């Protein structure tokens, strides 16, 4: 396997959040010291909590952390799927509708100069008779080289229960099969020899 130049101490440059509490979609540049200020209720606490969720994913207890917050129904963005121009001008209230056209998803990401990571969570079983239908599940994860995402930059990806190392020309190598929907790739693939990128980013 060719050496992809995994860094010793990747610096983080951006935090991205979508669908979490009051944060419909936000990308925040990060520096050596990032100061966030604003009026009460503008989302500062939710921004801090979202960063804590990414840390929980690295520790392997993200789903438990979400459950402690009240589960996905308590943390999902409750506003509209689309923000209209009238809403942005203050001419129309910003509120959710009774029906959703798209599956509810919580997306979190952290970007670095050399390594970046994103995770997508959603509800569990589609069987609405199941007692676990509202349980949070990890749907997808991505780990890529560099900051801005590009498919060619993917190093490791998770789709459902499968974690793969991404190879040239779409030739992917399975790293873990039958991964629990409550387990992130950081704990499913923990061997630094199999996936040094995962091991290194987890330490960041």
Pin down the residues of each PLM region.
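N-terminal pre-Walker A segment at the start of P-loop NTPase domains
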Residues: 2-24
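ABC ATPase nucleotide-binding domain
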Residues: 27-29
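Hydrophobic anchor at the beta1->P-loop junction of P-loop NTPases
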Residues: 36
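Conserved lysine of the Walker
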Residues: 44
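Conserved P-loop NTP-binding catalytic core
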Residues: 49-126
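Electropositive, glycine-dotted interaction segments
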Residues: 107-204
């Amino acid at each position: 396997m060719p050496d992809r130049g995994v860094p010793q101490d990747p610096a983080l440059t951006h935090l991205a959040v979508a669908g979490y509490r009051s944060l419909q979609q936000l990308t925040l540049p990060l520096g050596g010291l990032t100061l966030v200020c604003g009026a009460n209720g503008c989302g500062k606490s939710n921004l801090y909590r979202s960063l804590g969720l990414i840390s929980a994913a690295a520790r392997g207890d993200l789903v438990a952390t979400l459950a402690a917050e009240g589960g996905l129904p308590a943390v999902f963005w409750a506003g509209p799927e689309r923000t209209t121009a009238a809403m942005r001008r203050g001419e129309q209230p910003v509120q959710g509708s009774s029906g959703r056209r798209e599956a509810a998803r919580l997306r979190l990401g952290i970007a670095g100069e050399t390594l970046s990571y994103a995770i997508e969570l959603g509800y569990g079983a589609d069987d609405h008779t199941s007692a676990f239908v509202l349980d949070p599940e990890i749907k997808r994860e991505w780990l890529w080289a560099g900051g801005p995402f590009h498919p060619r930059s993917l190093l490791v990806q998770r789709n459902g229960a499968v974690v793969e190392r991404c190879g040239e020309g779409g030739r992917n190598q399975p790293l873990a099969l039958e991964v629990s929907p409550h387990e992130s790739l950081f704990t499913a693939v923990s061997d630094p020899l199999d996936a040094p990128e995962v091991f290194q980013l987890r330490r960041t």
